Curated annotation (Swiss-Prot):
PROSITE patterns: IF5A_HYPUSINE (PS00302). It comes from the Archaea. This is Translation initiation factor 5A. It holds the Pfam family eIF-5a. GO terms for biological process: positive regulation of translational elongation; positive regulation of translational termination. The keyword Cytoplasm applies. The modification Hypusine is found at K37. Belongs to the eIF-5A family. Its main location: cytoplasm. It is found in: Cytoplasm. Keywords: Cytoplasm, Hypusine, Initiation factor, Protein biosynthesis. GO terms for molecular function: ribosome binding; RNA binding; translation elongation factor activity; translation initiation factor activity. The keyword Protein biosynthesis applies.
Length: 136
């Protein structure tokens, strides 16, 4: 996977996604400082990691380009649950994925997981995270 694209900093908005330190993150806040007499405007971007929940921030000129992850939102079925992984099968391609429970499953979804249910998962930068339960 590893799909990403470039976007100009001035086009970013809260709620969108960005790659900071190689980690896909959701933008929480953007503050733009006005340019000085000979400088360019700078943007401070605060974001939370999708997989680890860590808060990260960067400062870039508004004219700079940054990497933005391409997030593939898909539907799968839980095939098996082990103490440390969940095995899901994609409903379109029938591929099997082993997702680690610690980093690959949202906290509010962990107690709802059982074999045979349908889940929505996100795939980005070669990593998978189960986001929500769709139903039986």
């Amino acid at each position: 996977m590893g799909d990403k694209t470039k976007v100009q900093v001035s086009k970013l908005k809260p709620g969108r996604y960005i790659i900071i330190d190689g980690e896909p993150c959701r933008i929480v806040n953007i503050t733009v400082s006005s340019p000085g007499k000979h400088g360019s405007a700078k943007a401070r971007i605060e974001a939370v990691g999708i997989f680890d929940g860590k808060v990260r921030s960067i400062v870039k000129p508004t004219s700079a380009e940054v990497d933005v992850p391409i997030i593939d939102k898909r539907v799968g079925q839980v095939i098996a649950i082990t103490p440390d992984t969940v095995q899901i099968m994609d409903m379109e391609t029938y591929e099997l994925y082993d997702v680690p429970i610690e980093t690959g499953v949202e906290d509010e979804v962990k107690d709802q997981l059982k074999e045979g249910i349908t889940v929505e998962y996100w795939e980005t930068l070669g990593r998978i995270q189960i986001k929500k339960v769709r139903g039986e």
